Amino acid sequence: LRRGDIIVFSHEHQTLTKRIAYVPGDVLPDGTIVPDDSYYVLGDNRSASLDSRFWEKPFVSRRTIIAKYIF
């Protein structure tokens, strides 16, 4: 998976669709490093999206990913 990919994943008993913004090893603006096999995701509608910026556990584990959109 790469930055910019749109994924479908399970998060807190919901199925969500978001875009990968940071991949394993990337450093977030606050200095946090994205863990191995994890992703930091953002919704395309940033002003209304509940995404990694707001979750207590901000990273999406690879094992929770259900699908990747292919265009």
Region spans (language model):
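Extended hydrophobic leader/signal-anchor segments used for secretion and membrane insertion
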Residues: 1-71
